[in-house]
Amino acid sequence: ALETDCLNLNERIKAEDTSSVQTEENVILVTPTYAWRIPHIVSDWLGKAELVGAKRIWFVMDCGSEIGNAAKYNRELAARKKLTYMGTAQIVMPENYIALFSAPDKQEAKAIVENAKPAIRSIIDCIRNGMEFPAPRNNLYDRFMSGAVNPIFCKKIVKADAFTVSDACIGCGKCVQLCPLNNIRLDKDK
């Protein structure tokens, strides 16, 4: 809808490639929400990579229910990058962190995606018109979840231990290709 070039951060992160990236003036970072913030691997990568040509940045975060006070940390990241912070927007999408939460069934997932369309249109309109996103909710709960809970949640809860192979594995290797941390490998095609 915005007709702009895309950069696959997963490929860059997986390859540990923090070389400079030629960008347009406007950068739109679309990322999942991990524990009420952007994933640490994404913020770490952004902290190291130079965005040549970038002047403004919008953060678009998909989430299962909420992004907490991620905007505070995104604003700080933008300041460190010397970019004009244009806001943080959330798009509620089907839960996909299956190690901890249940994914919705197909019908419920379709309904969640359909319900997200007005938010997506609003986000596109803001970016297209060079406008800041409206400030997201920021209450005590949001600040607590993104602040005190995030580091504990990431250290104690967000682990790969819950991901194991089963007889359903067909040995296609897709999980190996997609894992940005390179911590999945096939052993005897499983």
What label would you give each PLM region?
Residues L2-E3, K159-D161, D189:
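Generic structural motif recognizing short loop/turn segments at the entrances and edges of beta-strands
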Residues A1-R12, S19, T23-T31, A35-I152, ...:
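FMN-binding flavodoxin-like domain, especially the glycine-rich phosphate-binding loop
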